[in-house]
């Protein structure tokens, strides 16, 4: 669903993203077949907006602990 927070399930080195990074769904394609997802720093700077398949994301679980890491320039 749009504006849901998701977890990336695989590394995307070309975008500077790692499995476990959190993103926000900004657009849903084909009833959940794919998603446009925005990944931002804690300061609000956009790192990437990427099109992902349903297999590349998963919903967050309320018993998970978020983790912070520095972005790679």
Where are these regions (language model features)?
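Basic/aromatic-rich interaction segments and small domains that mediate binding to polyanionic partners
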Residues: 2-63
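Long, low-complexity intrinsically disordered regions
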Residues: 62-73
């Amino acid at each position: 669903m749009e504006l849901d927070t998701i977890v990336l399930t695989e590394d995307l080195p070309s975008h500077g993203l790692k499995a476990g990074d959190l993103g926000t769904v900004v657009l849903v394609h084909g009833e959940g077949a794919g998603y446009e997802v925005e990944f931002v720093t804690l300061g609000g700077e956009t790192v990437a907006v990427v099109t992902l398949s349903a297999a590349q994301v998963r919903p967050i679980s309320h018993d998970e602990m978020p983790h912070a890491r520095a972005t790679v320039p």
